[in-house]
Each structure stands twice: as C-alpha cells, then as structure tokens.
Amino acid sequence: MSESLSFRAAGRSDVGLVRKNNEDSGFIGKHFLLVADGMGGHAAGELASSTTVAIVAQVDNNKEKLEDLDSKLIEIPKVITKELKNAINKDSSRAGMGTTLTAAVVQENQLKVSHVGDSRAYLVRNKQISRITKDQTYIQSLIENNEITESEAKNHPQRSLLLQAIDGITESIPVITSIEIFENDKILLCSDGLTNVVTDEEILEIVNQFDYVGAVSALIEKALENGGPDNITVIVADLQKEKYENKIIVLGAAAEARNRIKLPGLEFPTDIHPFITSEFPALKSVTWLRKFAYVASFALIAVIISWGTTNWISKQFYVSNLGDNLAIFQGVNSAIGPISFSRPVQSFNLEVVVLTKDDQEVLLKGIKADS
C-alpha cells in the first residue's frame, strides 16, 4: 500500500527591480500550491492572478471538491475564465487581462499539476532537477523543433509570447500531469521572473544547499542579483511522511487589499501573510492633479539643476520596503508625477510582515540612514 505524503511549504513574491506593480500571485493552502503570473494593462494583470488565487483557494477549502481531483483540475481554468470575462464586461479597460496557472496538489503519493502558460513546476529528487511542466510559448516550440537552443532563447525578441493563457475570452484546457512522489522530494513552483534570469542548474544548486524556507529567499535574491527585470514568485515544498498542516499563505497581488476590493464577487482566504500595502490602497488618480504633477515635475527638475543639488541627493540614503522585504534606497523618499528621486540599491532577506503595524507605518514613510 502506498504511503500518503504531506508537504511543508514556504513562498515569497517580489516586485523585482524594474516593474512598478506586482502582477504575480501565489497561494499555499491545505492541499494546493499555486503560482499565477498576471498580464494586462490598467492593473488588470493583478486582478487576473488574484482571481486565480480566489478560485483555487475555494477548491482547496472544500474536501468534497477534492474527491474527483482530475475533473476539478480541468474545471478550475474554466471557472477563472468565466470570472475574468465578467470582470472585462464590467470594465472594458480590463480587456487583454490574463494569467498563467500552475497549480499542484498532493494526493497520497501522487502529485497532480494543472498547467497553463509559462510559469513552471519543478521536481527535485536525489539532488537532480526535472521540469514537471512545459512552457506553452512560441520559444518552447522553436526549441522543440531544434530551430534555436535554450541559450539562444534567453535573448530572443519573442521569448515572452504565450501560446496559452487564461484570458477570459477563449477556453483554456490545462495540461494535467500526475507523477509519483517520495519522501524528501522537493517541489518548486515559480513565475518566469525567476526562470528568465536564473538557470535550472542554479536553481538546483540553491535548493540542494538550503531547506525549503531558505531556498525561497535565496532564489528570490539570486533573481534580484541578476537584474530582477520582472516580478518574481517562488514556492518550495518539502514532501514528508509526517502529517503536516500548512497555514494558508497568499502571496503577491492577491494579498493586496486594493486588488481584492476590485473583485467584490470573490471570496479570498484568510491568510497569515498580508502584504504591507494591504491597509494602504492606492488612491484614484485625479486628472487635474496629474496635470499639475507633471508641470511641477519639470519645474522642480529645473530648480534642482539650478541649485546644483543632484550631488546632494545621490549621497542620501533611507530604509523602506521593496515589495515584501526591507531595502536600502539611494536618494530621497519623494516623487512628483513620474519623477522619483530614489532607487533601490540593496534588498535584504528580511520580510516586512515581521514588524509591528506601527513599525510598518514608519517604514512606509522611509527611515533616513547615514551614507
């Protein structure tokens, strides 16, 4: 008789060093692991990946829905498609929204994965790594046809072109994969913000070096070290015979209140890992204020140049949050219109959520540091 396994998992989502918003979402539930990489303008990507978390979390919380697991894994993208279609109908600016889906669930000694898009699931066993999923991209089709190499794909101009995604328009049929799993196997789910800048060999080295918690942080830091051009979401799970009940964790866009309140028809899980900005929803833009901000930006730039204070600004440093983590910024903690007077220079493997609410509020304002 096969032995039932359970998983201990950790995850983290980071906005990266280039993007302004995090369109990735992640979920660690009682049974499910999930990474969703949203896409689309006007914050639609955040809503698409957040919707995916809400739908998967509902299935995760319902034991009856897990009885016929294969059919549920096929049904999940259909439900997400319906919700995205409703969201687009309510607001036409959301047209073009979409998301990837890589959801994994442990059932006794089997791992079942439902996959759409180019987020990935990996298996690490006996210090070897293998991909459970296959990227549904134009680039992957070229690689399989031996038209380009994996190395050439890294710099290909169409490397981000998806052949499959959940978009609220066409019905997506996920690829369902089932593999036998063993104690001490590790499962890794991630968005392409990791795999575009960190190789499989580097991922394996890090996962073998750290436990599942340390591996998550080390992988995120490696992606940031390599430029962090995209949002990065990583979940690592350690499979054990010992019964283990995970606390529910929501990552990235789905953890932000400003995204949840735009999806009033969906029920989100109560999680232990709220994003720091969850109590500070973004303010709606005001046209006249935006115009004023742009005019003021150019005026301020002229003043800065005339006063010769650029050198002074470059010598200022402060501590604040960069996504989920603490970071040091060079410059001053202010911006007018599109002009920011600071940039992140170092991110630390220390999550903001460990701070008290009072300390988080202080951190949001920035803590001046000596140069």
Language model regions located:
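PP2C/PPM-type serine/threonine phosphatase catalytic domain
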Residues: M1-A296, L300
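Short structural boundary motif marking the start of a folded domain
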Residues: L5-A10, K315-F317, D324
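Loop/turn residues immediately N-terminal
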Residues: S119, G193, K315, N325-L326
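Alpha-helical transmembrane segments
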Residues: A299, V303-W307
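Aromatic-capped interface at the extracytoplasmic side
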Residues: S306-N321
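Short extracytoplasmic/periplasmic juxtamembrane "stem" segments immediately C-terminal to an N-terminal membrane anchor
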Residues: S320-I339
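Extracytoplasmic/periplasmic/luminal assembly and interaction segments
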Residues: I336-S371
